[in-house]
Amino acid sequence: MVLQNDIDLLNPPAELEKRKHKLKRLVQSPNSFFMDVKCQGCFNITTVFSHSQTVVVCGNCQTILCQPTGGKAKLTEGCSFRRKGD
C-alpha cells in the first residue's frame, strides 16, 4: 500500500531540510555563517558573523554596520551583504 504523502527519507527535498532543526537534518549543519558587509558611506568591506553578539562598526568611518538582536544580527538599513563561500 502506497500513501500519497510518502517522503523519500534518503533524499529529502532541500526546502524541507532547511526548515528542520540543525541537529535533526540528515546531515547536521549550522545555521550561522560569515558574511561580507559593505559600508554604505565609504564602501569598505568588513567580515561579520551572522549571529554576532556585539555591535559591529566600520573600520574607516565608524558607522554601525549591524546590531545584535537575540539570534541573527540586524544589518543597518542601506548596508549590503554577501554570504562568504566555503
UniProtKB/Swiss-Prot annotation:
Cellular component GO terms held in the UniProt record: cytosolic ribosome; cytosolic small ribosomal subunit; plant-type cell wall; plasmodesma; ribosome
Induction: Down-regulated by UV-C treatment.
Zinc finger (C4-type): 39-61
Names of the cofactor(s): Zn(2+)
InterPro entries for the chain: Ribosomal_eS27, Ribosomal_eS27_Zn-bd_dom_sf, Ribosomal_zn-bd
Matches recorded under Pfam families: Ribosomal_S27e (PF01667)
Molecular functions per Gene Ontology: mRNA binding; structural constituent of ribosome; zinc ion binding
Family: Belongs to the eukaryotic ribosomal protein eS27 family.
Official protein name in the record: Small ribosomal subunit protein eS27y
Phylogenetic placement of the source organism: Eukaryota, Viridiplantae, Streptophyta, Embryophyta, Tracheophyta
Protein encoded by which gene: RPS27B
